[in-house]
């Protein structure tokens, strides 16, 4: 047998042994999670922005499962509150944040002031800032949630939160506001009024 063939067989055997050990360990030491926390976490927007007062969406989901309010997530908006209310079987509350008057903002980096320290990149929970050490940084506008966690760590104050320009794509279209009348209900109402006459 050649040396290469022996090395391949030995590596394959080691891989099989370590794979079996990892497989056994994943079954033996499996952590059982609360299924309601997983369901709540799947409803939350996963921006990890911290605007709810928790360090991310998973800790907030755990807090909701333990009885905290369901209306603390600004990126999720009223739609998320309603989904959480349906899941938890509680009344849908108004958002704890003023969502209507708050204009959506995104971070903007003044590149002439940026020193490339990467502190904003480290603070961004959604990786919306790109750049490198001692290089210019920029914000990916479509990824930015407007949480403004990147503003405070900047030593040169080169980050500004600017309002997002309203376009046809970002306009709050009320597409579900079209009233739909159930024909059978209308017909029954007409029969009732006819029988009263």
Curated annotation (Swiss-Prot):
GO terms for molecular function: 4 iron, 4 sulfur cluster binding; electron transfer activity; metal ion binding. GO terms for cellular component: plasma membrane. [4Fe-4S] cluster 1 binds at residues 49, 52, 57, 73. InterPro entries: 4Fe-4S_dom, 4Fe4S_Fe-S-bd, 4Fe4S_Fe_S_CS, 4Fe4S_Ferredoxin_RnfB, Elect_transpt_cplx_RnfB/RsxB, RnfB/RsxB_Proteobac. Binds 3 [4Fe-4S] clusters. [4Fe-4S] cluster 2 binds at residues 114, 117, 120, 154. Keywords: 4Fe-4S, Cell inner membrane, Cell membrane, Electron transport, Iron, Iron-sulfur, Membrane, Metal-binding, Repeat, Translocase, Transport. PANTHER family: ION-TRANSLOCATING OXIDOREDUCTASE COMPLEX SUBUNIT B. This is Ion-translocating oxidoreductase complex subunit B. The lineage of its organism: Bacteria, Pseudomonadati, Pseudomonadota, Gammaproteobacteria, Vibrionales.
């Amino acid at each position: 047998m050649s040396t290469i063939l022996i090395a391949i067989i030995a590596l394959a055997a080691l891989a099989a042994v370590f794979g079996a050990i990892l497989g056994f360990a994943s079954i033996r030491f499996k952590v059982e999670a609360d299924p309601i926390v997983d369901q709540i976490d799947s409803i939350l927007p996963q921006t990890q922005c911290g605007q709810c007062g928790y360090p991310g969406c998973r800790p907030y989901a755990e807090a909701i499962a333990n009885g905290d309010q369901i209306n603390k997530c600004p990126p999720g908006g009223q739609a998320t509150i309603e989904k959480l209310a349906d899941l938890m079987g509680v009344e849908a509350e108004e958002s704890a944040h003023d969502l209507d008057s708050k204009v959506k903002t995104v971070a903007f980096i003044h590149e002439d002031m940026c020193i490339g320290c990467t502190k904003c990149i480290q603070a961004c929970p959604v990786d919306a800032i790109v750049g490198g050490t001692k290089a210019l940084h920029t914000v990916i506008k479509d990824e930015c949630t407007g949480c403004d966690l990147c503003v405070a760590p900047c030593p040169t104050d080169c980050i500004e939160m600017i309002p997002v320009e309203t376009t046809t794509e970002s306009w709050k279209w009320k597409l579900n506001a079209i009233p739909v009348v159930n024909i059978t209900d209308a017909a029954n109402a007409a029969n009732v009024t006819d029988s009263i006459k």
